[in-house]
A protein has these predicted regions:
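Extracytoplasmic/secretory soluble proteins
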Residues: 9-10, 22-540
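Positively charged n-region of N-terminal signal peptides that target proteins for export
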Residues: 1-10
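C-terminal motif of bacterial Sec signal peptides marking the signal peptidase cleavage site
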Residues: 17-21
Length: 540
């Protein structure tokens, strides 16, 4: 199967050779949810500001245009996750500065981690937010193609030249969809290598292997089960599995086995290896898939997860609270650093360790620019003011510090250049932790305050950089810049997603009686849903 999609990705990788957050809901992505609702294009909304209607004929970056700030604008900023306890207190401090410099305020709205894909889709459809967090794992490219976000090319020159200069053309170009810029990424280069986060203290206590392969992960879990039969092992559900690759969390562990171009393979059960990205092959209809599903059933029968896992909701604090001994889906180095801090604060002698899938399968690269970014929602009440506020939140040191760390002297202090949370230091639960607004999209690499744990994080990044240099395309993410246009097969795509929820999820959860029969039924249902058309169009 000679396919254009990966060849396109490969050319993107060459252009992006200068490359410098997370998750939880059901198998449908936000883009899928919109398609199912019949929304394939987000209509443009009227804007009340004259400045937003103006265009510029400048062909090179210009000085910031004079913007009318006479009227206060109140904006809504939609971000992921849960709100911090001191949300209102920090917002008040933030808005005091934004009113002074932009005559604007922001109301931070949070998705929570329950059904966040559906909530994100609803937010896009309703156009109730002005600024919104975007990421490749939230299908930024597909949503941008549908018209969900404002084009930023001209406004970056006329409204926010400082922001454009800070981010740089290379990063902005990686955010282009159809030749247009629809998002502004953060400026902190990081590795977001997915992997397994696990309890190192229990591994060492019972002399178990590091869970760095399917075989060793199984031995690690079995060893803990035998020694501590009442200890939960994996709190896997359908919630980390999103898009059109997997239906159940546990299947993420299969990344140990394959050196795929992207974690969990490609959409529609296709796959390609990182070293040979133009050679796309069929995974769902392969013998490997059958073998993998038999492994999932073995693990389910061994009691590695609950028999009600398909209907369980995501407990994002399960690992933190000792309810499980490993997490295999949606993990990354930053989540490991958070776990280290959580365990230290808990004071129970727990220790968290991390192994990236790429350490075993040989595929390691830094995060794409669209890993964490900000877009202006189509329908924003004042796009220019929104971009001006975004510039202030990223470029203004005082404002950025409030957004990321809270109020100095109340929530944090800086000692010898290191961030210190004052409540944690006093043995209290932080009411505004580090990056308490979950604004990973507003990380400024030039001014980001390091935490004590950042020493460990940088050690992880340094290790991954060395491993990434040994790959065929050294430290280049050749996949995440790809954007799928599924207008011509949206009905089939939706049907395929439904089959994944109904038939693939139980297979990957091992909650079927006969794997061979269940695989056959899954494949039959996929054919009926139109998988062939999806694959043909996807790989044109």
């Amino acid at each position: 199967m000679k396919k254009k999609v990966l060849a396109t990705l490969l050319s993107m990788a060459m252009v992006a050779g200068v490359i410098t957050g997370c998750g939880g809901a059901g198998t449908q992505s936000a883009a899928d949810q919109l398609a199912e609702q019949g929304v394939t294009e987000i209509p443009a909304a009227e804007t009340t500001t004259e400045a937003a209607e103006a265009t510029t004929e400048a062909e090179a970056p210009a000085e910031a245009a004079e913007i009318d700030l006479s009227q206060q604008v109140d904006l809504v900023f939609y971000v992921m996750g849960d709100a911090p306890q001191d949300e209102e207190l920090v917002e008040a401090a933030l808005n005091e500065k934004l009113l002074e410099k932009c005559n604007a305020t922001v109301d931070m709205q949070f998705s929570t981690w329950t059904d966040f894909q559906q909530k994100y889709a609803n937010e896009i459809t309703a156009q109730s937010a002005d600024l919104i967090y975007i990421a490749n794992w939230l299908n930024y490219g597909q949503l941008a193609s549908s018209g969900a976000f404002e084009e930023l090319d001209d406004m970056l020159d006329t409204v926010a030249p400082d922001l454009k200069a800070l981010v740089g053309d290379a990063n902005l170009n990686m955010c282009r969809v159809g030749g247009k810029i629809y998002a502004v990424p953060n400026t902190w280069a990081e590795y977001v290598c997915n992997g397994v986060k696990y309890r190192e203290d229990l591994r060492a206590k019972y002399d178990l292997p590091v869970p760095d392969s399917l075989e060793n992960l199984e031995a690690y879990l079995l060893g803990i089960k035998e020694n501590e039969p009442n200890q939960g092992l994996l709190t896997v559900t359908t919630e980390e599995s999103q898009g059109l690759k997997t239906g159940f969390d546990a299947a993420w562990a299969l990344n140990f086995k394959y050196n795929w171009v992207a974690n969990n393979g490609l959409d529609y059960g296709l796959a390609a290896n990182y070293d040979t990205p133009s050679e796309v092959y069929d995974y769902w209809y392969s013998d490997d898939f059958v073998d993998d599903m038999k492994l999932m059933k073995k693990w389910a029968d061994l009691g590695f997860w609950s028999k009600s896992a398909l209907s369980d909701t995501n407990n994002s604090d399960a690992y933190k609270n000792g309810l499980c001994v490993a997490e295999v889906a949606g993990q990354n180095p930053n989540k490991q650093i958070t776990a280290i801090a959580d365990f230290e604060n808990a004071g129970q002698g727990w220790e968290s360790a991390y192994v990236a899938y790429g350490e075993t399968n040989g595929v390691i690269y830094p995060g794409h620019a669209t890993q964490n970014g900000t877009a202006i929602v189509r329908g924003c009440k004042d796009p220019e003011r929104a971009l001006l506020v975004l510039q202030a939140m990223l470029c203004d040191d005082e404002i950025n510090s409030i957004v990321q760390y809270g109020i100095k002297g109340t929530h944090y202090d800086v000692v010898d250049g290191i961030y210190k949370n004052l409540q944690e230091e006093a043995g209290e639960t932080p009411t505004f932790p580090y990056e308490g607004f979950n604004t990973w999209n507003l990380r400024n690499g030039e001014t980001k305050l390091p935490q004590k744990t950042d020493v460990k994080l940088q050690e992880m990044f340094d290790k991954y950089a060395v491993l990434g240099e040994k790959t065929k395309f050294p430290n280049v993410n050749i996949y995440d810049g790809f954007s799928e246009n599924y207008d011509s097969y949206s009905a089939e795509r939706s049907a395929v997603s439904n089959v994944m929820r109904q038939y693939l999820a139980p297979l990957e959860a091992g909650l079927v009686d006969d794997v061979d029969a269940a695989v056959e039924e899954f494949r039959t249902k996929m054919t009926e849903a139109g998988i062939d058309k999806c694959r043909e169009e996807y790989t044109k």
